Amino acid sequence: MKEKGRKVIATNRKARHNYTILDVYEAGIALVGTEVKSLREGKASLVDAFATVDDGEVWLRSLHIPEYTQGTWTNHAPRRTRKLLLHKQEIEHLVGKTREGNQTLVPLSMYFSDGKVKVELALAKGKQDYDKRQDLARRTAEREVTRELGRRVKGMR
């Protein structure tokens, strides 16, 4: 029986810190059997992964899926380039945006959706150090405001 819902395999936690997310896409991914088995064990790393558009196809590079422990000589290469499956209009949109410059394709997460592996791919723009500091200061200020409001509601002040 196929599993329903969404089971997250891996997330790229630094992506939202290092990039400003402009647009998000859901893409399928072409895998071999031992890769899927390794992903079912929850083993994958999106840390250095990025996507490129070559000849009208989107490729995910530097994604690390370790070899399946029970695999034999049929095992896969852990860091091989994998094809992402998107609609033609989405690919054309991504080609236009990435050619403008300063924009890149970054995987945010990888998950099972109804038994199929999907990648949440983001069109993103790199952040400068001062942008990261501004975001940190803004989040800290918001946290202080919500904490103070919570105290006032509870009658602590």
Curated annotation (Swiss-Prot):
CDD domains: SmpB (cd09294)
Gene Ontology terms: cellular component: cytosol
Domain of life assignment: Bacteria
PROSITE patterns reported for this sequence: SSRP
Gene Ontology terms: biological process: trans-translation
Single Gene Ontology MF annotation: RNA binding
SUPFAM superfamilies in the record: Small protein B (SmpB)
Keywords for the protein's UniProt record, in alphabetical order: Cytoplasm, RNA-binding
Locations listed in the record: Cytoplasm
Keyword Cytoplasm annotated: yes
Family (UniProt): Belongs to the SmpB family.
HAMAP family given in the database record: SmpB
Main function: Required for rescue of stalled ribosomes mediated by trans-translation. Binds to transfer-messenger RNA (tmRNA), required for stable association of tmRNA with ribosomes. tmRNA and SmpB together mimic tRNA shape, replacing the anticodon stem-loop with SmpB. tmRNA is encoded by the ssrA gene; the 2 termini fold to resemble tRNA(Ala) and it encodes a 'tag peptide', a short internal open reading frame. During trans-translation Ala-aminoacylated tmRNA acts like a tRNA, entering the A-site of stalled ribosomes, displacing the stalled mRNA.
Name of protein: SsrA-binding protein
